[in-house]
């Protein structure tokens, strides 16, 4: 099973193309992320199918509800065999602590991460929804709240990963979506970085979607990402 930093986002509406991509990639070289659209369409059996193929699965459902409800949802998420699950840090310390406690009751506890500020959010978006910005300050506040609640790490923009590492320590995970190599389009993400820059800035895991999933040769695109990371490791 892979210990790669790369997590490929299976942003598909149904199981067919998701499993087809999984069969073209390698569990030795990446983990896979299942989000809301795919999970709602296909359910736990999709996660099971990926786990049986040898993949670590990040179940990206971003739970945000009252503590008891989130605790129950996390137990159910753990039962799928997921390697990592997440909640929204905006749910508060009590909710995150309840999630962590619930996962601790499971036999093979998944990693728990907390979403800080979505990578589609800019400072203007934060002002629009009434959150004190700028984004990097909001991310740090939420990361420290998550760490205090016993969460394993956060989901944050790669642009804030170094700040989170400084505030929360090296052992606190920084899972970074919005990763776009120079050869890929930016898409709808507002705060993006290249894979090499993200790792240099403190990211522990990189979530990559369209640069791989929409590539004519997904395994070749994955190899290109691996080469970028290897070159960064050598600097």
UniProtKB/Swiss-Prot annotation:
GO BP terms: namely: 'de novo' pyrimidine nucleobase biosynthetic process; 'de novo' UMP biosynthetic process
Catalytic residues as annotated in Swiss-Prot or TrEMBL:
62 (proton donor)
The record's top EC class is: lyase
Keyword Lyase applies: yes
S-S pairs: none
* EC annotation from Swiss-Prot or TrEMBL: 4.1.1.23
Swiss-Prot/TrEMBL catalytic activity: orotidine 5'-phosphate + H(+) = UMP + CO2
Q: Where does substrate bind?
A: 11, 33, 60-69, 119, 180, 189, 209-210
Quaternary structure (record): Homodimer.
- What is the designated name of this protein? Orotidine 5'-phosphate decarboxylase
């Amino acid at each position: 099973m892979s210990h790669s930093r790369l997590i490929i986002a299976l942003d598909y509406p149904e199981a067919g193309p998701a499993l087809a991509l999984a069969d073209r990639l390698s569990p030795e070289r990446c983990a896979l992320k299942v989000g809301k659209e795919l999970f709602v369409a296909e359910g736990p059996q999709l996660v099971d199918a990926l786990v049986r193929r040898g993949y670590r699965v990040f179940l990206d459902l971003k739970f945000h509800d009252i503590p008891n409800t989130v605790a129950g949802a996390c137990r159910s998420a753990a039962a799928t065999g997921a390697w990592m699950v997440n909640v929204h840090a905006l749910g508060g310390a009590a909710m995150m602590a309840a999630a962590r406690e619930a996962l601790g009751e499971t036999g093979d506890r998944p990693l728990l991460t907390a979403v800080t500020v979505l990578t589609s959010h800019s400072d203007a978006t934060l002002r629009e929804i009434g959150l004190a910005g700028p984004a990097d300050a909001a991310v740090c506040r939420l990361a420290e709240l998550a760490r205090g609640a016993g969460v394993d790490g956060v989901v944050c923009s790669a642009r804030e990963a170094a700040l989170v590492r400084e505030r929360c320590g090296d052992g606190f995970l920084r899972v970074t979506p919005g990763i776009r190599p120079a050869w890929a389009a930016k898409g709808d993400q507002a705060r993006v970085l290249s894979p090499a820059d993200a790792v240099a800035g403190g990211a522990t895991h990189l979530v990559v979607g369209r640069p791989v999933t929409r590539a004519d040769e997904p395994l070749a695109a994955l190899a290109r990402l691996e080469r970028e990371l290897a070159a960064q490791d050598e600097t």
